[in-house]
């Protein structure tokens, strides 16, 4: 079989075609810490095998976010928060996308709980209670119960490569109007609507067990949220100084001429039209925080 990565539509995905590698043991350089990774692939309808990549609906996002190390504040990667419902709730397509991700989650959990996988991981007592946070879809909860009417969110990471201390973002970003590539870092904290192709990459097994979901490609429609000017301002008239040449002809020199003027092709931030974000969403939910603190002394 040849390696052939294809986009698998949610309606066409068959979880029985999801393939898992044997656990690979890896270690973090210069530390005694090791972990296991189970790579995920997919058998396409033509029999070829490639990465498992599914498309999202057109979703609202708060833009590219930096992931930082809590101790050093160093940037360790990037992610995109995706709001999975529109302002009116969930459309049929959005519900189907959520159901597709959760069917993949369930298939991965079933694989982890097989005797052969537990033996390979040397986690013989692993059970479903150890996988409570395995689902990457975040839902706001109050006293342990899901808050009704709040959109679930997904926080997929960008695909990056690290070499010699440098980090490069490999995820593709494309402008929906022009079709031109966009620099990912120009989208930091920029509100936008976007359609992504998500790579269901692997299962990470370390201190925690999590499903690794990455953004393979992202088509972006930026939302203009700046203020617009309401008062008209008359431009100053251009004064022309008449200079007599040796031939008796007159030349005009425009004062204040700026060769670098863009003729309004690029708007200043103050001149941007105010556009209501579409869809309107609740403020970005906080990511689940780890409980901590000092223990009470007896």
Regions found by a protein language model. Give the residues of each.
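Extended acidic low-complexity intrinsically disordered regions
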Residues: 232-235, 249, 261, 290-298
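Compositionally biased, intrinsically disordered low-complexity regions
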Residues: 49-52, 65, 79, 146, ...
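OB-fold ssDNA-binding interfaces and closely related basic DNA-contact patches used
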Residues: 2-164
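Acidic, serine/threonine-rich low-complexity intrinsically disordered regions
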Residues: 276-291, 298
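Extended serine/threonine-enriched, polar tracts that run as long, contiguous segments within proteins
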Residues: 139-223
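Long, highly charged low-complexity segments enriched in Glu/Asp and Lys/Arg with interspersed Ser/Thr
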Residues: 206-256
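Acidic, Ser/Thr-interspersed intrinsically disordered low-complexity regions
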Residues: 240-281
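Hydrophobic transmembrane signal anchors and adjacent membrane-proximal interface regions, especially
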Residues: 5-7, 35-40, 99, 126, ...
């Amino acid at each position: 079989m040849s390696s052939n990565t294809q986009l698998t539509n949610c309606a066409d995905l068959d979880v029985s075609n999801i393939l898992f590698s044997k656990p690979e043991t890896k270690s973090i350089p210069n530390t005694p810490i090791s972990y296991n990774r189970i790579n995920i692939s997919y058998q396409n309808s033509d029999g070829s095998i490639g990465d498992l990549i599914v498309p999202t609906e057109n979703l609202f996002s708060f833009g590219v976010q930096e992931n930082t190390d809590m101790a050093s504040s160093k940037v360790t990667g990037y992610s995109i928060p995706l709001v999975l419902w529109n302002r009116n709730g969930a459309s049929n397509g959005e519900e189907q996308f959520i159901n597709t991700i959760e069917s993949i989650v369930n298939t991965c959990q079933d694989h982890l709980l097989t005797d052969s996988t537990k033996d390979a991981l040397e986690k013989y007592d692993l059970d479903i209670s150890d996988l409570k946070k395995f689902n990457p879809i975040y839902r706001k909860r109050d006293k342990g119960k899901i808050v009704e009417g709040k959109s679930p969110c997904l926080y997929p990471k960008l695909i990056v490569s690290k070499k010699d201390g440098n980090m490069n973002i490999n995820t593709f970003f494309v402008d929906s109007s022009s079709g031109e590539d966009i620099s990912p870092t120009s989208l930091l904290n920029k509100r936008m609507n976007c359609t992504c192709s998500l790579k269901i990459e692997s299962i990470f097994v370390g201190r925690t067990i999590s499903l690794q979901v990455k953004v393979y490609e992202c088509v972006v429609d930026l939302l203009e949220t700046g203020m617009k000017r309401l008062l008209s301002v008359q431009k100053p008239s251009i004064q022309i100084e008449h200079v007599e040449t040796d031939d008796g002809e007159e030349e005009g020199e425009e004062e204040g001429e700026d060769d670098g003027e863009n003729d309004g092709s690029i708007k200043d931030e103050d001149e941007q039209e105010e556009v209501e974000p579409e869809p309107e969403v609740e403020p970005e939910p906080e990511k689940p925080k780890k409980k901590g603190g000092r223990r009470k002394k007896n």
